[in-house]
């Protein structure tokens, strides 16, 4: 086991090394040279990478870092509650999305009142809504389908075969009920965000406060001592506790730093390549850039599912959706206000209001699918088809491939209505399951609060 584990770690690190060399030669060494007071010039070969070369190098770094990140999270489950380890993984995996959105929010504040500032505010919202819809439309739906149809799915205890066409389901861990309820609260609030003229301090207080409450609850959860790992996590979990914790921290820090530095040039490289073949820049920023920034998360989830840990994979996706739907939205107004030099609402136009409503409506429908702690092939396909059809229809309108009697904004509102109607029907038909879910979550929160300052114990304790 030791040789195979070290070989896997070495292979993952090797994928990241080209980008480490580029960053070291073009950013780190020049900074050190300037600090030390002498001149340094990066090699021309590394300083002038072509767009395609940049995409390849950064893409490999993202791939390798995603594996390191997944191993760190799985190893950490020996010492902290699984939900908390996955929450850390989720935040680190989507850190680049925060960075890209923060950049647009900063520009919106720095250039407030100008066309550039107005556009930046709209781009911040477009990037955020694109990322959130990708996470459900491709992430939740795609992983459910991959879990059921992948080779060896019969050995996955989460996959349940049922009679009927496309009736097989992925059964989810009931422990994710907490995340589902918190996500529902954030979703209901999100419907109200556009009504205030933009993202304001009340949005920040509620959404960030909601996520802080969630973290407070899961931190008081119990460590699961019987988690059966194989491969790299099993090897690392055999380390003595101090060495194990140090290794986890190192893996989280290294992979998180590489993902943070690599995804932005990876996304921009994809944008440039897309624009070169005629794809509009706004469309690229809303869809291609977020897809690139979500790539580490999706890679981690596919890795977990491939190990027959589909429940952990879904937990990671739901945790990512929760932190992006709370922390990401809530912190945009903070960044905008810092750039502005005073408190200010992050404003956006009506089309972006429609984007937020559509994103909230999609989330509402997706949550309705999960309240029985399972998702079928039919339901996953419905999520995927609704998502893809809206994106392709909007793209066709932008490119004037089709002519419709409605605008792109009207399409957003129509799809929002479809999601809300479908979600409402499901909530009504599954009201008993929803009631049980709420009661279970209330009990979980009550138990966590009643433990006071008690901390979870390591599996070694």
Range-by-range predicted roles:
Residues 1-461:
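Hydrophobic alpha-helical segments, chiefly the membrane-spanning helices
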């Amino acid at each position: 086991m030791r040789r195979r584990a070290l070989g896997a770690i070495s292979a993952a690190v090797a994928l990241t090394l080209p980008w480490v060399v580029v960053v070291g030669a073009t950013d780190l060494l020049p900074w050190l040279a300037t600090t030390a007071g002498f001149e340094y010039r990066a090699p021309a070969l590394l300083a002038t990478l072509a767009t395609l070369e940049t995409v390849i190098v950064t893409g490999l770094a993202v791939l390798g870092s995603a594996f390191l990140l997944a191993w760190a999270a799985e190893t950490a489950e020996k010492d902290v509650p699984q939900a908390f380890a996955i929450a850390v993984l989720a935040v680190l995996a989507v850190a680049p999305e925060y960075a890209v959105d923060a950049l647009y929010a900063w520009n919106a504040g720095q250039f407030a009142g100008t066309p550039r500032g107005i556009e930046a505010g709209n781009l911040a919202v477009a990037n955020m809504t694109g990322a959130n819809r990708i996470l459900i439309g491709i992430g939740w739906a795609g992983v459910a389908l991959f879990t059921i149809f992948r080779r060896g799915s019969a050995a996955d205890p989460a996959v349940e075969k049922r009679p009927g066409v496309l009736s097989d389901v992925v059964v989810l861990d009931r422990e994710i009920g907490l995340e589902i309820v918190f996500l529902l609260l954030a979703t209901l609030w999100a419907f109200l965000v556009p009504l205030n003229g933009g993202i304001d301090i009340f949005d920040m207080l509620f959404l960030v406060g909601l996520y802080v409450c969630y973290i407070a609850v899961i931190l008081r959860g119990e460590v699961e001592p019987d988690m059966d790992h194989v491969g790299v996590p099993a090897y690392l979990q055999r380390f003595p506790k101090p060495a194990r914790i140090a290794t986890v921290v190192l893996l989280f820090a290294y992979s998180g730093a590489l993902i943070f530095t690599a995804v932005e040039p990876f996304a921009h490289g994809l944008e440039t390549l897309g624009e070169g073949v005629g794809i509009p820049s706004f469309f690229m920023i809303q869809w291609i850039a977020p897809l690139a920034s979500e790539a580490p998360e999706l890679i981690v989830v596919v890795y977990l599912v491939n190990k027959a840990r589909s429940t952990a994979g879904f937990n990671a996706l739901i945790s990512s959706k929760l932190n992006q739907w709370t922390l990401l939205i809530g912190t945009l107004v903070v960044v905008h206000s810092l750039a502005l030099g005073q408190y200010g609402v992050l404003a956006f136009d009506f089309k972006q209001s429609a984007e937020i409503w559509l994103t909230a409506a999609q989330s509402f429908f997706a949550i309705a699918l999960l309240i029985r702690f399972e998702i079928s092939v039919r339901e996953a396909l419905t999520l995927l088809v609704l998502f893809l059809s809206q994106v392709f229809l909007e793209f066709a309108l932008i490119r004037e491939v089709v002519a419709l009697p409605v605008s792109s904004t009207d399409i957003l509102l129509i799809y929002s209505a479809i999601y809300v109607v479908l979600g409402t029907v499901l909530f009504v038909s599954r009201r008993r399951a929803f009631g049980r879910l709420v009661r279970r979550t209330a009990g979980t929160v009550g138990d966590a609060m009643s433990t006071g300052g008690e901390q979870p114990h390591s599996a070694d304790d």
